[in-house]
């Protein structure tokens, strides 16, 4: 479904990700793990064509359903983002206008993807919150971002990202700004998306415990390169990579969830 083939990402002449490859099948969850600055977020931004500041894929290719993404026109990207590939951020509150109601932001998001009335879009947004099992969907739509907890804002962000049932969901540090109990809830919700809708997910995280609990495959990154990779069992139990073992030793608890 997604094939990243030996990509190098550069800003100017400086490579920040070098010779990165991974494959993701339909319904799989993969995690990119590593310290800040290791290139994790750069990889998923390259997949979505959202590299900032003149960043570019200088080598390699990215294939989605067998088609290269690197030759997409702006119109092709607009059709793809949100419908086929969607993204949630570290703090979904950052993508919500603080002086507008949740519902107004949801309506605007929906109407960028289809030509329907504001009333129809409001109903669709409310129905999506209900589909994601958020209690009091209408009250949430009427609320401002500051009136919701960080965990609830994140769940709203997930609901928005899933509105058009994308095949691929990219999650950039979706739990790092949350307390451990809420982290566990968000992790479970993303796993339910995979189980219910067959959504493929790439999770960027510095927490190997989160990755180990929810992932089929794990890629450990360091200094813009792949340091280690393999399925969950290999990384947890059989990896002999010193950096991977250091990350495992630093794993905190996750709201009572065990990763081994």
Name what the model sees in each region.
Residues 56-68:
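Conserved ABC transporter NBD signature motif
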Residues 211-213:
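A short, surface-exposed alpha-helical micro-motif characterized by mixed small hydrophobic
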Residues 229-230, 238:
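ABC ATPase "signature
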Residues 163-167:
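A short, proline-enriched helix->beta-strand linker immediately N-terminal to the Walker B motif
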Residues 33-35:
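The feature captures the beta-strand-to-loop junction immediately N-terminal to the Walker
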Residues 184-197:
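Helical segment within the ABC ATPase nucleotide-binding domain
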């Amino acid at each position: 479904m997604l094939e990243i083939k030996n990509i190098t990402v550069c800003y100017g002449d400086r490579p920040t990700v070098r010779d990165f490859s991974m494959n993701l099948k339909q319904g799989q969850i993969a995690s990119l793990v590593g310290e800040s600055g290791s290139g994790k977020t750069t990889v998923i931004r390259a997949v979505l064509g959202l590299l900032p500041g003149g960043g570019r894929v200088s080598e390699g290719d990215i294939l989605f359903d067998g088609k290269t993404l690197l030759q997409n026109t702006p119109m092709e990207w607009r059709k793809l983002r949100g419908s086929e590939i969607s993204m949630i951020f570290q703090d979904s509150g950052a993508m919500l206008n603080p002086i507008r109601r949740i519902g107004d932001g949801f309506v605007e998001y929906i109407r960028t993807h289809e030509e329907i009335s504001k009333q129809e879009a409001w109903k669709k947004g409310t129905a999506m919150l209900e589909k994601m099992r958020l209690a009091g969907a209408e009250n949430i739509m009427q609320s401002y971002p500051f009136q919701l907890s960080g965990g609830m804002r994140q769940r709203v962000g997930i609901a928005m990202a899933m509105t058009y049932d994308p095949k691929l969901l990219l999650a950039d540090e979706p739990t790092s700004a949350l307390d451990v109990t809420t982290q566990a809830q968000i992790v479970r919700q993303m796993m339910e998306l995979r189980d219910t809708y067959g959504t493929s997910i790439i999770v960027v995280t510095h927490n190997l415990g989160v990755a180990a609990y929810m992932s089929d495959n794990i890629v450990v990154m360091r200094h813009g390169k792949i340091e280690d990779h393999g399925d969950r069992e290999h990384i947890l139990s059989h990896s002999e990579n010193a950096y991977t073992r250091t990350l495992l030793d630093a794993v905190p608890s996750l709201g009572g969830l065990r990763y081994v």
